[in-house]
A protein has these predicted regions:
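Active-site-adjacent substrate-recognition loops and nearby beta-strands
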Residues: 148-154
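Intrinsic disorder
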Residues: 154, 180-182
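Acidic/polar-rich alpha-helix caps and helix-coil junctions
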Residues: 1-148, 184, 188-190, 194-367
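Extended polysaccharide-engagement surfaces of secreted carbohydrate-active enzymes
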Residues: 151, 174-178, 192-194
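Short, cationic low-complexity segments
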Residues: 154-173
């Protein structure tokens, strides 16, 4: 049942990125190596069927680190939210916002989950498998099954074996600060100043320094960096949280807003922000459309880099993505020559092309 649920997670990742994909429901063999693409609508229907079966089979009382049946409910809620905002993927008759609510509220009402008191600690080994965690990958330096620390730890932040490739657009950081100037989540999410582990020299990137070269123009994403500066191994042991309770509360806020449950929607946002000593900003008070825009930004402030950014940006369609993500970035007054200009071509930015390696080895795919 857990393997079925994990398969659904991966199917969802694939269909979100590529749309129509080969849908494997049996293992390939010598007589079954090639598979034509199935419509994304059929892939989502299969995910729903599998997740419903996983929910019925998964245990409610396994030990620490094991996902419970409520992870399947959260997956179902996420899928129904996608179908609610993409009518061509659904059956044309279901109230997908209500279905999403019904699944998400099961997780909340289970009483199994709560917010971890310290936001930044979620991204350390001491914050692993907390009551906030709904589905968490168990990673180990000994098992050598995670490169997150190596890829996200800035250059010379620790003693060795890292690259520090991944930064955050300055416009994303600026938007976060503009909405919540004193947000404790800023320190848990971004890094822009540190001393090198080898010689104690200062390293500054934006906003701790000016934007006079590309490397210095964007803060690092700190969530998955190795926090132990004396660590020198290639792999590390910080787990990766796939689903957590704060995400569920924001989902319930978005869903409740679409169902005109105004007070309930605001209550979920208040729970998430109360953890970090904040209250909902003025955009939450401007009616359904204003609340919708605010909650879509809130996902970014709370969950940046945790696996849902690309989909949340695109889930409400091309025009919403263009007007709420791409153009605000491209027209940012703080933008300079060290910023990327985001593409606006719908045919190129909504879905990825099937990789050439798959096209050339699968006789039933030609594009």
């Amino acid at each position: 049942s857990r393997s079925r649920g994990l398969g659904d997670v991966y199917k969802r990742q694939l269909v979100r990125l590529w749309g129509d994909i080969p849908l494997w429901t049996v293992l390939p063999d010598n007589n079954n190596l090639h598979k034509a693409k199935s419509p994304a609508k059929d892939v989502y229907a299969q995910i729903i069927s599998d997740a419903q079966q996983a929910e019925s089979l998964m245990n409610e009382s396994l030990g620490i680190g094991y996902p419970l049946k409520f992870a399947a409910n959260m997956l179902l809620a996420k899928v129904y939210m996608t179908l609610a905002t993409n009518p061509d993927l659904g059956d044309g008759s279901s109230n997908y916002w209500q279905l999403a609510y019904d699944e998400a509220i099961k997780v909340k009402n289970s009483g199994r989950y709560s917010l971890h008191p310290n936001y930044s600690e979620l991204f350390t080994q001491s914050g692993e498998n907390s009551r906030e965690s709904i589905f968490e990958y168990q990673l180990s330096e000994i098992a050598s099954n995670s490169q997150l620390g190596r890829n996200y730890t800035p250059w010379k932040y620790k003693t060795g074996m890292h690259f520090g490739w991944f930064s955050v657009h300055a416009s994303v950081y600026d938007s976060h600060v503009a909405n919540y100037p004193a947000d404790p989540r800023l320190d848990g999410t971004y890094l822009h100043y540190y001393t090198r582990a080898d010689n104690n020299a200062e390293v500054k990137v934006y906003p701790s320094t000016g934007r006079n070269n590309f490397r210095a123009s964007h803060p690092y994403l700190f969530k998955f960096a190795e926090k132990d500066k004396s660590h020198s191994a290639q792999y590390n042991s910080q787990n990766y949280i796939m689903y957590r309770y704060a995400d569920l509360l924001l989902m319930l806020a978005e869903i409740s807003n679409e169902l005109s449950k105004d007070a309930e929607a605001m209550g979920y946002v208040e729970q998430v922000l109360d953890r970090v000593g904040l209250t909902p900003h003025i955009s939450y008070q401007g009616g359904q459309a204003s609340f919708r825009d605010a909650i879509m930004r809130e996902y970014r402030f709370e969950l940046l880099g945790e696996g849902e950014d690309s989909h949340n940006n695109r889930r409400r369609g091309y025009n919403y993505f263009l007007n709420n993500t791409i153009l605000p970035h491209n027209n940012d007054p703080n933008k300079n020559q060290y910023d990327l200009t985001l593409n606006t071509d719908e045919t190129r930015i909504m879905k990825l092309p099937i990789p050439l390696g798959e096209v050339t080895t699968n006789d039933l795919i030609d594009d």
